[in-house]
Amino acid sequence: MKIFGLIKLDEYKRAHANVRGALDQWQLEVERSHWSGPQDVKSRYPSASILSDNKVIFNIKGNKYRVVVKAKYEKGIVFIEWVGTHAEYSKQNFQ
């Protein structure tokens, strides 16, 4: 999958070195994947949450962090919408 919005991910990695390795691994896995739909995401990431409008919530580093993306499966792209801790995520309203 092609990832758009990497600047959000890169900025977060620079500011939070303790999660950099896990986010690097997630990025590499996503870039090497081709998902045709949410079922492909769930088969690789069973703990991911699939929301309406093709949004996907990924749990990173033992669910301490979250990455929120919007997937365009037919085009093979994902847009990073948000990156943060689980506690910060709980204050957001993703639907």
Predicted regions span which residues?
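Basic, Lys/Arg-enriched alpha-helical interface segments
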Residues: 1-64, 72-79, 87-95
